[in-house]
C-alpha cells in the first residue's frame, strides 16, 4: 500500500505549529529556556509523610518565601496570558489574510 504525502502551504504549516505550541503543556521554563516538567513529576522525596512521626515538628515556610513563590506564579500566569493573546491575534491575522 502506498502512502501519499499531503502538500501544505507554509502558512498552513505555521498555523499547525502554532496550534501545537498552544495545546501541548510544556511545563515550567527556566532562565536558560529549557522546559522542565511540572513540579512533583520527578520528585526524589516520598509523596507523603505517612510514615513520619506525627510528633516531629515540620519546618514552616517563611512568609517571604511564600510571597516570592506567589509573585513568580503570578508572573508566569501573566506571561502565559500574554503569549496566548499574541498567538490568538497572530492566528486571526493569518485567517483574515487567507480569506478569499
Curated annotation (Swiss-Prot):
Residues 1-30 form the signal peptide. Highly expressed in fetal and adult brain, cerebellum and trachea. Weakly expressed in spinal cord, fetal liver, kidney and heart. One of its GO terms (biological process) is neuropeptide signaling pathway. Transmembrane segments: none annotated. Residues 31-59 form a propeptide. Keywords: Cleavage on pair of basic residues, Neuropeptide, Secreted, Signal. It is found in: Secreted. InterPro entries: TIP39. Pfam families: TIP39. One of its GO terms (cellular component) is extracellular region. Belongs to the parathyroid hormone family. Ligand of high affinity for the PTH2 receptor (PTH2R). Plays a role as a potent and selective agonist of PTH2R resulting in adenyl cyclase activation and intracellular calcium levels elevation. Induces protein kinase C beta activation, recruitment of beta-arrestin and PTH2R internalization. May inhibit cell proliferation via its action on PTH2R activation. Neuropeptide which may also have a role in spermatogenesis. May activate nociceptors and nociceptive circuits. This is Tuberoinfundibular peptide of 39 residues. It comes from Homo sapiens (Human).
Amino acid at each position: 500500500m502506498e502512502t501519499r504525502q499531503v502538500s501544505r502551504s507554509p502558512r498552513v504549516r505555521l498555523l499547525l505549529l502554532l496550534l501545537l505550541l498552544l495545546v501541548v503543556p510544556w511545563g515550567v521554563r527556566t532562565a536558560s529556556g529549557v522546559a522542565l516538567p511540572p513540579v512533583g513529576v520527578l520528585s526524589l522525596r516520598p509523596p507523603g509523610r505517612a510514615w513520619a512521626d506525627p510528633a516531629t515538628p515540620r519546618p514552616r515556610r517563611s512568609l517571604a518565601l511564600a510571597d516570592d513563590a506567589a509573585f513568580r506564579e503570578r508572573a508566569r500566569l501573566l506571561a502565559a496570558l500574554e503569549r496566548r493573546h499574541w498567538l490568538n491575534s497572530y492566528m486571526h491575522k493569518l485567517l483574515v489574510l487567507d480569506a478569499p
